[in-house]
Curated annotation (Swiss-Prot):
Amino acids binding ATP: 8-15
Protein name listed in UniProt: ATP-dependent helicase/deoxyribonuclease subunit B
Species of origin: Listeria monocytogenes serotype 4a (strain HCC23)
Coiled coil location: none
Entry-linked SUPFAM superfamilies: P-loop containing nucleoside triphosphate hydrolases
Keyword NAD attributed: no
Gene behind this protein: addB
C-alpha cells in the first residue's frame, strides 16, 4: 500500500506520464488500473485512452469519477437499496421542509418565495456533506456570533433537520454515495490488486479525502497528480498563491498517508513545459503567478490580443480566424472558445457560427422552464390558484396541449385566437364566468347596444368556435381543480396532475412533436420533447417517493412542484467528433487543445469582481470559520482562484492563444479590458493589440479580403459595404469580386438577391390596380364622414381599416369612444323622454334634470361594453362620475334652452339608404358614386317671421372647435357635411326650406371654476355658464344670433355661443361667424373634397402619407403604425406638412378649388 504524488505546472506532462506508465504496467501484470478524474472529465479521458496507441484501447484500465466509482462499489457490496434523489428532488424536499417550518423562521420566512432560494440551500447542504460539517457543529460555531448569523443558522438548522426527517434514511444524495463508498471500500473484491490514479483535481473536499484515505488502505498503490508550483512545496505555503488549494491538498495527502501508515514513494516533480510549441506560450505559462516580474524580449509567436467594437464584432472576428485555421489544416475539434460569462455569448455564438458554417458545441445546460410542456403544467396550476385569470389560462392554451391532436395546429391556433379575443373583449377573468351555464353568446357589437338584432350566420359560426374551444379548456381544467381541491396527500396531488396530463393526451402530443422534429432534421429539438416527458415523469415519481404520504394543501403542492419545474434542465448531447467547443471557463471539459480563444476578457469579468452569493455572505463565512467551522473559505479569501483559472486557460493550448475583449456592450456602454490583459501586454513588449472591426472599409484590400470567409456571413458585410457605396464612399475591388461570385451559382444567386434587395428598399406602397380597388371598395362607395377624414389623414390608414378590414383586438375596458357613446345615448334618451312627455328642455327644474340624467344612466349602464359599468367597484365609481357629467350637461342644456329660441327637431338622425334622410350622393369617375351615411347628434330649428334656421349640435367628450384649416385639408368635414345634409333635405325634414344657422360643439365634461377669492353662488353659476359656451361657427346674421341667445346684449359676449355684440349692434371680430355665401362655399368645397377622396380611392391610392399639422399627426393614435412601418428617418417616409393659414386665406382657396356638383 503506497502513495505517490506527481506534481508540476500545467503542460509539464503529468497526465501523459501517468498514461504511459499505466500502459507499460499493463503489459507486465494483470492488475486493474483505475483513473479517478472530475465528473466533467470522464468522457475526455476515455477518448484520450482510446486514442493512445500503447494502451491497446482500455483493456485493464477503467475511468471513473468519485461518484461513478461509488456506484460501482456499492453495486458490488450492497448499499444501493435506497432511492437516489436528483437535484430536482432535493430542491422539492427542501421546499417542503421550509414550508413546514415557515412560521418558526426568524430571517428566511420571506425568502421562502424567492426564486433560487432552494437552489442556494441545496448547495449549502451539499457543501456541509462534502466538508463533513454537521448541523450541530454549525450551531455551535454560531453561538457567539452576531444576531444576524445566529438567526440564519437557527433557520438553516430547522430546515435541515426537517429535510433529514423527510428523507428518513430512505433516500440518497450524490454526497451520500461518497460517505457510503468510504464505508464499503474495505469490503470490495473489485478493488483487490488495483492501482488508483487520481488526476485533474486542484483540491479535495473532506469527504473525498476520506475516500482517498480508504483507497490507500485497500489498494496496492494510489498515485495523485497535482497541478502546483514545485518550489512552493519546497519552500512553504504561500497564502496568496494561485496554487494554495493544490498545495494544501499535497500536505493533506501526506498527512493521510502518515495516519494510515501508508508508505510514500518518492514524489515526481515535472518542471519543463512540454505542451506549448512556441517559446512565447511556454514563457507565459511558466511565469504566470510569479511574484517577480519577468518580460519576454522577442516578438511573441501565436499569442494574440484583440479588441472588438462589441461582442458581435468579437465573435465574427473569431469566426473568421477559425475559418482560416481550418484552411491551414486544423480540425474544428482542435479549437475551443472559452468565456467567463457564457450567458452573454451563447446565443450570439450560435447565430454567428452557423452563418460561418462552423460546427459548434455549446457546453451549457439549458433550463426546461420555457419548454411548452413545462409551461403548460405551471400555467394550469397558476390558473387554478388565481381563479382562472386570463393570463395563466392563455399561457396554457398557447402551448397547444388543450387542442384536439387530430386537427392541424394552424387551425387550432386560429380558433384559440378567436376565443382569446372573445375572452378579452368580454372581461372573462374568473372561474365563475368560464363555467357559467349555457353557451357564450357572440355578438359583433362594440360599445352601446340598445337595439339587439338577430344573430347573423357569421356570428353563429363564431359562437360555435368559441364554445367548442371553451369546452376543450374547461373540461380538463375543471376536473384538475376538482381533484386537486379534494387531494390531501402528496400521492393524491401527483395523481390528479398525472391524470390531467393523460386527459389532454400530453404524451401523444409530445411524441407527435418529436416525430415531426426528427422528420424535419431537428434532432436536438426532438430530444428535448422526449426529455420533457421523461423529466416530468421522473419528477412526479420522486415527489411521490418522498412526499407521497405527506399531508399537503394546494398552495404547498404548487410551490413544491414549481420548485421542481424550475430545477429541470435538458441533458447535453456529447460533442461530435469534429466541433468547436464553446464553454464556460470554470467548467470546461478540455484536454489536448491546440487553439484556445479566451473571449470577453473585460475588467470585472477576469478576474471576477466577487459578489456575495448563496445563503452565507463572505462576512458570515469568515465569522463562522473563525469559530472553527469547516465551511469553505469566503470568495475574498480565495484570491488565488481567479489567477488559477486564468492560468488554466493560458496554459491549455499547445499551438495558439487568442485573447479578446469587447470595448462596449450591446447598449454602447464602455467596457474596459481585463487587468490580466494589461499584465500580459506589460510582459510582452512586442505584442501588438489588433482590432476586430464591424466595418472593414478602413483597412487595406488585403486585410479586407480576410473578412470574406463564408458565403452567408459575407452577404451581411457586402450589404453594409454597398450601402456605404450608395452614399458616395469608395468600395474596394474585394467587395465587387465578392458580389460577382454570388451570381456564378444559381442557388447562391437567389440567396444574394433576397439579401441585397434591402439596398433598394423603400417603405412605399404601390397604387392598387383599378379592378382590385373596385373589388375592395365597390363601384359605389358607401362611406361615413369619419372614414373620409381618415383617408385625408393617411391613405394607408384608410386602406388598412376599410380595405384590408384590419381592426384592433377588443379589450374589456372603458375607452374614450365608449364614454362618448354613453353621452350621446344619454342625450338621445333624455330628449326622447321629453318628447314622449311633451316637455321642453327649458321648462325642466334642476331636480328634474338630475332625475332625467339618473334614469338615462340606469337605462344605459347595462348596455355598454358587455355590462362593463356593472363589473367592479371601480367601474361603479366611474359610472358615478359619468352620471355627474350627464347631470351637468342636462342642467346646462336646460339653462341654454331658457335663453334660446332654437329647439331640437332631430336627435340621433340617421342619413343613408336606410336612414331618416337620404345619403349625400357624390358623383365619381367612371359612373361610380360615393354615398355618405352617418348619424347626426342633434338638429335644432328656430323661426322668425318668414325665415327658418337650422343648426347642428354635436356632443363631444373632449374640447373641440371648427378649424377651417382642418376643413380645407379634409381632416374636419363632419359638421359642415351634416349642415349641408340638413339644409339640403330641410323640405323633407321640416316641410320647408331653411337657412344654415351654424355648427356647434357641446363639450360634456365636469366643470370647475378657478378663482383667487371666494365667489357668491350667482358668480359661480355665471362662471360655470361661461365654461359651457359652445364652440364652432355660426351665421353672421343678427337675427340668427339673437335667436341662439335671446339674452345677448350690446357690448356683451354670449355665454352660450361664440358671438359678441358691439355697442353699435354689429358682431365683433372675436365672434366665430361666416356669411351665408361663405357657408355655401364651404358646403360646396366639402362636396368637392369627397369627390377628390372617392376618385383617389377608386384609383387605388394607398400611400403611406400621414400629415403633420403643427405638432399633430395621425400616427400618434394610429392602430396600424407597426403594420405600415412609417419611419420619418427614411427619405421615402416623410410627413405631409400642412400649413396653418388664416381663415380669410382658407376661404379664398376653398372658393378657387371648390368646383361644382
Amino acid at each position: 500500500m503506497t502513495l505517490q504524488i506527481i506534481a508540476g505546472r500545467s503542460g509539464t506532462g503529468k497526465t501523459t506520464h501517468l498514461m504511459d506508465e499505466v500502459g507499460e504496467k499493463i503489459k507486465q501484470n494483470s492488475k486493474t488500473y483505475i483513473f479517478i478524474v472530475p465528473d466533467q472529465m470522464t468522457f475526455q479521458m476515455e477518448t484520450s485512452f482510446l486514442n493512445k496507441e500503447n494502451l491497446a484501447g482500455m483493456l485493464g484500465t477503467q475511468i471513473f469519477s468519485f461518484s461513478r466509482l461509488a456506484w460501482k462499489i456499492l453495486q458490488e457490496t450492497g448499499g444501493l437499496s435506497k432511492t437516489f434523489l436528483s437535484q430536482t428532488g432535493i430542491e422539492m424536499v427542501i421546499r417542503k421542509a421550509a414550508l413546514d417550518q415557515k412560521d418558526k423562521l426568524k430571517i428566511f420566512s420571506r425568502a421562502t418565495s424567492r426564486k433560487g432560494f432552494y437552489s442556494e440551500l441545496a448547495n449549502l447542504f451539499k457543501e456541509m456533506k462534502q466538508e463533513e460539517v454537521s448541523i450541530e457543529d454549525m450551531v455551535q460555531s454560531a453561538t457567539n456570533l452576531s444576531t444576524s448569523v445566529n438567526n440564519k443558522v437557527h433557520d438553516i438548522s430547522l430546515i435541515y433537520q426537517k429535510y433529514e426527517e423527510l428523507l428518513a434514511d430512505k433516500f440518497l444524495e450524490n454526497e451520500d454515495y461518497l460517505r457510503l463508498l468510504a464505508e464499503k471500500i474495505a469490503d470490495s473484491d473489485y478493488l483487490n490488486r488495483t492501482e488508483i490514479v487520481i488526476d485533474g483535481f486542484t483540491s479535495f473536499s473532506k469527504q473525498e479525502l476520506t475516500v482517498i484515505g480508504e483507497l490507500m488502505r485497500k489498494c496496492d498503490k494510489v498515485t495523485v497528480s497535482l497541478t502546483l508550483n514545485v518550489p512552493e512545496i519546497q519552500h512553504g505555503l504561500d497564502e496568496y498563491s494561485m496554487f494554495k488549494a493544490s498545495t494544501e491538498a499535497y500536505y493533506a495527502l501526506l498527512e493521510l498517508a502518515k495516519l494510515n501508515g501508508t508508505q510514500v514513494e518518492e514524489n515526481k516533480f515535472f518542471l519543463e513545459n512540454k505542451r506549448a510549441k512556441t517559446e512565447s506560450l511556454a514563457f507565459l505559462a511558466n511565469t504566470w503567478g510569479h511574484n517577480k516580474f519577468m518580460s519576454f524580449k522577442n516578438e511573441p509567436q501565436n499569442l494574440k490580443i484583440h479588441q472588438a467594437n462589441n461582442r458581435r464584432a468579437e465573435i465574427e472576428g473569431i469566426a473568421r480566424e477559425i475559418r482560416q485555421l481550418v484552411l491551414n489544416g486544423y480540425r474544428y475539434r482542435d479549437i475551443a472558445i472559452l468565456t467567463r460569462n457564457l450567458g452573454d455569448y451563447d446565443v450570439l455564438c450560435e447565430t454567428v457560427m452557423e452563418a460561418y458554417n462552423i460546427p459548434t458545441f455549446i457546453d451549457k445546460k439549458r433550463a426546461m422552464a420555457k419548454h411548452p410542456f413545462i409551461e403548460f403544467i405551471r400555467s394550469s396550476l397558476d390558473a387554478i390558484l388565481f381563479n382562472w385569470k386570463y393570463e395563466p389560462i392563455f399561457q396554457a392554451v398557447k402551448t397547444e396541449f388543450f387542442f384536439d391532436i387530430t386537427e392541424k395546429s394552424s387551425l387550432n391556433r386560429r380558433k384559440a385566437d378567436i376565443l382569446e379575443n372573445y375572452v378579452l373583449e368580454n372581461g372573462i377573468q374568473n372561474k365563475w364566468k368560464w363555467e357559467k351555464e349555457g353557451d357564450w353568446v357572440y355578438r359583433k357589437i362594440r360599445g352601446l347596444s340598445t337595439n339587439v338584432l338577430p344573430q347573423t350566420d357569421e356570428e353563429i359560426h363564431m359562437q360555435s368556435i368559441i364554445n367548442e374551444m371553451r369546452s376543450l379548456i374547461v373540461n380538463p381544467l375543471a376536473t384538475l381543480e376538482l381533484n386537486l381541491r379534494k387531494a390531501k396527500t402528496g400521492m393524491e396531488f401527483a395523481l390528479a396532475l398525472y391524470h390531467y396530463l393523460e386527459q389532454v393526451n400530453a404524451v401523444e402530443r409530445l411524441e407527435s412533436w418529436r416525430q415531426r422534429a426528427e422528420e424535419q432534421g431537428y434532432l436536438e429539438l426532438a430530444r428535448e420533447h422526449e426529455q420533457a416527458w421523461s423529466s416530468i415523469s421522473a419528477l412526479l415519481d420522486e415527489f411521490v417517493e418522498v412526499l407521497g404520504e405527506e399531508t399537503l394543501d394546494l398552495d404547498s403542492f404548487t410551490e413544491i412542484i414549481g420548485t421542481g419545474l424550475d430545477a429541470l434542465e435538458f441533458s447535453l448531447l456529447p460533442p461530435s467528433l469534429d466541433q468547436v467547443v464553446l464553454s464556460d471557463m470554470e467548467n470546461a471539459k478540455l484536454l489536448d487543445m491546440k487553439v484556445i480563444f479566451a473571449i470577453g476578457m473585460n475588467d470585472g469579468v477576469m478576474p471576477l469582481r466577487q459578489k456575495d452569493k448563496g445563503i452565507f455572505s463572505d462576512q458570515d463565512r469568515d465569522a463562522l470559520r473563525a469559530e472553527d467551522s469547516k465551511l469553505k473559505p469566503s470568495a475574498k479569501n480565495n484570491i488565488g482562484e481567479e489567477d488559477l483559472l486564468a492560468y488554466k486557460i493560458i496554459s491549455l493550448p499547445s499551438d495558439k492563444l487568442f485573447l479578446s475583449y469587447p470595448a462596449a456592450d450591446e447598449e454602447g456602454k464602455v467596457l474596459s479590458e481585463s487587468n490580466y490583459l494589461r499584465k500580459i501586454k506589460g510582459q510582452f513588449n512586442e505584442l501588438n493589440e489588433s482590432v476586430y472591426l464591424t466595418d472593414p472599409s478602413l483597412l487595406s484590400d488585403a486585410e479586407q479580403s480576410s473578412y470574406i470567409r463564408s458565403k452567408q456571413a459575407t452577404l451581411g458585410l457586402l450589404t453594409s459595404q454597398l450601402q456605404m457605396y450608395k452614399r458616395g464612399y469608395t468600395l474596394s475591388s474585394v467587395w465587387w469580386d465578392a458580389y460577382n461570385s454570388y451570381f456564378e451559382n444559381e442557388k447562391e444567386s437567389i440567396m444574394a438577391k433576397q439579401v441585397l434587395s434591402s439596398l433598394y428598399y423603400e417603405n412605399k406602397t404601390k397604387p392598387l390596380q383599378e379592378t382590385t380597388a373596385k373589388n375592395l371598395f365597390g363601384e359605389t362607395i358607401h362611406a361615413s364622414v369619419s372614414r373620409m377624414e381618415k383617408f385625408f389623414s393617411c391613405e394607408f390608414q384608410h386602406y388598412a381599416q376599410y380595405g384590408l378590414k384590419l381592426e384592433e383586438r377588443g379589450h374589456f375596458q372603458l375607452q374614450a369612444v365608449d364614454m362618448g357613446e354613453i353621452f350621446h345615448g344619454a342625450m338621445e334618451w333624455i330628449s326622447a323622454e321629453l318628447k314622449r312627455n311633451n316637455l321642453d328642455w327649458g321648462n325642466l327644474t334642476e331636480e328634474e334634470c338630475k332625475q332625467m340624467a339618473k334614469l338615462a344612466m340606469t337605462f344605459l349602464a347595462p348596455k355598454i361594453q358587455h355590462e362593463i359599468l356593472l363589473s367592479s367597484k371601480r367601474m361603479e365609481y366611474i359610472q358615478y362620475k359619468l352620471l355627474q357629467i350627464i347631470t351637468r350637461a342636462t342642467t346646462v342644456l336646460n339653462e341654454q334652452a331658457k335663453s334660446s329660441a332654437f329647439r331640437p327637431v332631430g336627435l340621433e338622425v340617421d342619413f343613408g339608404l336606410k336612414g331618416d334622410i337620404p345619403p349625400l350622393k357624390i358623383p365619381l369617375q367612371s359612373d361610380s358614386e360615393l354615398l355618405l351615411q352617418g348619424r347626426i347628434d342633434r338638429i335644432d330649428m328656430a323661426e322668425q317671421d318668414d325665415r327658418t334656421f337650422l343648426r347642428i349640435i354635436d356632443y363631444k367628450s373632449s374640447s373641440h372647435d371648427l378649424a377651417l384649416t382642418e376643413v380645407y385639408y379634409g381632416l374636419a368635414l363632419q359638421m359642415l357635411t351634416y349642415l349641408d345634409i340638413v339644409v339640403t333635405n330641410a323640405q323633407k325634414m321640416i316641410g320647408k326650406t331653411a337657412e344654415p344657422a351654424g355648427v356647434l360643439y357641446f363639450h360634456m365634461h365636469n366643470q370647475y371654476v378657478q378663482a383667487e377669492k371666494e365667489l357668491s353662488d350667482e358668480a359661480i353659476a355665471k362662471e360655470l355658464q361661461k365654461s359651457s359656451k359652445m364652440k364652432g361657427l355660426i351665421l353672421s346674421d343678427p337675427v340668427a344670433v339673437s335667436l341662439m341667445d335671446t339674452t345677448l346684449e350690446k357690448g356683451k359676449a354670449s355665454t352660450i355661443i361664440p358671438a359678441e355684440i358691439k355697442q353699435n349692434g354689429e358682431l365683433s371680430a372675436r365672434s366665430r361667424t361666416a356669411t351665408r355665401a361663405e357657408f355655401d362655399k364651404m358646403r360646396q368645397f366639402v362636396r368637392h373634397k369627397y369627390q377628390e377622396a372617392g376618385n383617389k380611392i377608386l384609383d387605388g391610392a394607398v400611400s403611406i402619407n400621414p400629415y403633420k399639422l403643427k405638432e399633430r399627426t395621425p400616427c400618434q393614435f394610429c392602430s396600424f403604425r407597426s403594420f405600415c412601418g412609417f419611419d420619418p428617418s427614411l427619405t421615402s417616409n416623410q410627413y405631409r406638412h400642412l400649413a396653418n393659414e388664416k381663415a380669410e386665406t382658407i376661404l379664398t382657396k376653398m372658393d378657387m378649388e371648390g368646383g361644382t356638383q
